[in-house]
Every structure is written in C-alpha cells, then in structure tokens.
Amino acid sequence: MIFSSEDAMNYKMMGKFLSQILIVEAGFMVPALLISLYTGSRAAVYGFGLSIFITAGVGALMYYFCRNSTRRFFAREGMVCVAGSWIAISFFGCLPFVFSREIPNFVDALFEIVSGFTTTGSSILGDVEALSPGIMYWRSFSHWLGGMGVLVFLLALSPNGERGKWYTMHLLRAESPGPNVNKLVPKMRTTARILYVIYMVLTFINFLFLLLGKMPVFDAVCTAFGTAGTGGFGIRNDS
C-alpha cells in the first residue's frame, strides 16, 4: 500500500506549536526569577535562571527546525498537541523546584507542579513556609494558570483567520467528547479570550479584598492565585 504525504503526521507543525508553548512558559517564569533576585535567594535565582535558559532554548531550537512547517493540521495533530502540551509544561515547569534544590526529588517536583496545573491541590510539602518567595510564587501561579485550563489558554493564543479556525477546531476535538464542534469554533476562540479577561479581573478583585483584610502584598498575590484557581494551594502550613 502506498501512502501519500497527506497521510503522514505533520511533525513540524506539532513541533512549532509545542515550541511556542515552551517559549511562553519560559516567559511566565521571569516574574518568579525577578522575585528571587529581589529577595536575594541565590538558589532560586539559579533554579529559575537555568530553567528559563533550558525551556526557552529548547523552545527556540524546536521553532527553528520546525519554522517551515506546512499549515496542514488535523484532529490527530490536535490530539498530540494537547497531550504534548500537558507533558511539556509539566516537565519543564518542575525544573525550578529541582534546580533550586527546594524540592530536589524530580518525581516529587513533578507531582507538585502537575497538582498545580491541574488544580488538584495535593502537595508533597510538609513545610510550605520553608519555600523561598520565588518558588512559592511559581507554585501558586501554576494553580492560577491551570484554573482556566490548559486548553482554554491554548485557544486564547490561537491565531485569527482561517488558520486559527483549524487550530481551534482540532484542539477542541482533542478534548471535547461531543460529535461536532465545527459550529462552535469562531465563538470558542473569542470566548476563550473573553474568559481570560474576566478571570484576570476576578483575580484582581480577590487580591484587592485580601489587601483590605490587611494581608501583605506578596501573600495576597499568591493567595489570590490559589483561590481563583479553586485548587487551594496555600502559603501557610496551617492553611
């Protein structure tokens, strides 16, 4: 049996998609690095600096080698992109924990970040307050990012136009059990962006109320992330 090029998986398109996710994730680590620099936590600075370098570097290399991909993007590519995105953000997201030696065991670090991105709220930490501010921020932020779901985040990033329509449709098919999502595509992409704006506004309101309750700014930020994400990651041992 002879297979045409249309039958093959579009690996370059999938690689390009995942590379963009990694570059965005590296950008999300920058605030945690700045917090670590400000608080003088050398181990955390090293952990985030190395993690950003590796994550952005891998993403940049993938983008370079996959930059000339065709636009062919079907349901099978969508499934791989959704599954691959979960694996990639979890693997690279746990690196700051490991490199800073604050959660030195890779399996424990992976469990902690997956718990954050999935808003499970379970933790292997016996003493949360021992974490440096930068690591604590990253842990809480993973909760906030996962609160709206990785799929919604991917939809919010998808491009406009006909190409974006194909991205959105097949990403939705990868996670939605319904038989037909084609009619939802234009609205879903716009809705995803609107939802993130609402989510950020609600998080900010949450933050303001915590400040009114005399909570320190940093604690209010981390707590707002944890509560908005509904997973319940706390920053105190007795929370």
PLM feature spans:
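Membrane-proximal intracellular helices of multi-pass ion channels
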Residues: 1-239
